[in-house]
Design a protein with these regions (language model features):
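Flexible "arm" and connector segments at domain edges
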Residues: 1-65, 69-101
Length: 101
């Protein structure tokens, strides 16, 4: 199973690009357009995941899923959250689920 520490690195990249707004930065451009645009892009990526699940191979599904998670990370950052907040929630749910068995 892959380790998830690299998610911290991606989170820091998102924060840095949001703060410094370098030229030619996709993250900076998306963040500058605001939450509605970030949300729209996340929705588009979600649709692409569904399409890949229904009509594409596994590699394409994994690729589109990575895009979805990346854009989710940008959205979470725009709400002063990060992916580790989601991981913690999943961990809490897992503890509840496993304690019931």
């Amino acid at each position: 199973m892959a380790k998830i520490e690299f998610l911290n690195e991606i989170t820091e990249i998102i924060k840095k690009r949001k703060l410094t707004q370098p030229e030619n930065s996709y993250i900076a451009e998306l963040v500058a357009e605001g939450l509605p645009k970030i949300s729209q892009k996340l929705g588009e990526e979600a649709v692409e995941v569904v399409v890949a699940a229904l009509a594409e191979d596994k590699a394409r599904l994994v690729s589109e899923s990575a895009d979805l998670i990346f854009h989710l990370m940008i959205l979470l950052d725009s709400k002063d959250l990060n992916i580790l907040d989601v991981v913690k929630e999943l961990d809490n749910r897992n503890k509840k689920w496993t304690s019931k068995n």
